[in-house]
Amino acid sequence: MANNFSQLARKSKTNSPIEKVSKEQTGTPSLEIYKLGDDVLRENAKRISKVDNSIRNLAKDMLQSMYAAKGIGLAAPQIGIKKELLVIDVNFEDAAAEPLILINPEITDYGTTLNSYEEGCLSIPGVYLNVVRPSTIKLRFRDEMGRPRKMKADGLLARCIQHEMDHLNGVLFVDRVTSKEDLNKELIKEGFHQKDVIPIK
């Protein structure tokens, strides 16, 4: 996957906005999505020092892979690239809605209300389990043009952002599941192993 990033960096040298990506959920993801048990998912991502076309091209390919895999979020570490980059689209059924591209995201505030909701992950296909998270967050990040942004998110968007940001720190949603019995049952059913889970303490 490191070679893929080098190829992306050579695609263009101009400073242009990201091209619109079709939301059609068909075909094969253009990028390999690593699965639970792959060591790369447990490594910390690094901040992006310069937002240029290599980053925008990477985000574009991540969006294509996310849509093809029928996901609503994807983090760069999931494709083997240790960079603080997320793509998210909780409105994937709305062709006009713009996806979110978050570069170097930081959560600055968590709401006090906690909610339990079922989550899944493109790196652990077929496994769906409840996870408790704050229902609202505030964050800052840079957009695909490198501009600083701030936003408040709630509901599914807040959950998705937190889920994807966990990937930047080598954390997977199964690490946060409190019911070990349900977790083990789901993992075995889909061919995964509980030894690859690192519980959050």
UniProtKB/Swiss-Prot annotation:
Chain intervals for the UniProt region annotation (Disordered): 1-24
Biased composition (Polar residues): 1-17
Binding site for Fe cation: C121, H163, H167
Signal sequence segment: none
Catalytically driven reaction(s): N-terminal N-formyl-L-methionyl-[peptide] + H2O = N-terminal L-methionyl-[peptide] + formate
EC number: 3.5.1.88
Claim: Hydrolase is one of the keywords in the record: yes
Gene Ontology terms, MF aspect: metal ion binding; peptide deformylase activity
Pfam families xrefs: Pep_deformylase
Active site: E164
rRNA-binding recorded as keyword: no
Top class in the EC scheme: hydrolase
Cofactor(s) the record lists: Fe(2+)
CDD domains on file: Pep_deformylase (cd00487)
SUPFAM superfamilies assigned to the protein according to its UniProt record, in alphabetical order: Peptide deformylase
Co-factor remark: Binds 1 Fe(2+) ion.
Keywords: Hydrolase, Iron, Metal-binding, Protein biosynthesis
InterPro entries: Peptide_deformylase, Peptide_deformylase_sf
A GO BP entry: co-translational protein modification
Job of this protein: Removes the formyl group from the N-terminal Met of newly synthesized proteins. Requires at least a dipeptide for an efficient rate of reaction. N-terminal L-methionine is a prerequisite for activity but the enzyme has broad specificity at other positions.
Recorded family membership: Belongs to the polypeptide deformylase family.
Name of the molecule in the record: Peptide deformylase
Biological classification of the source: Bacteria, Bacillati, Cyanobacteriota, Cyanophyceae, Synechococcales
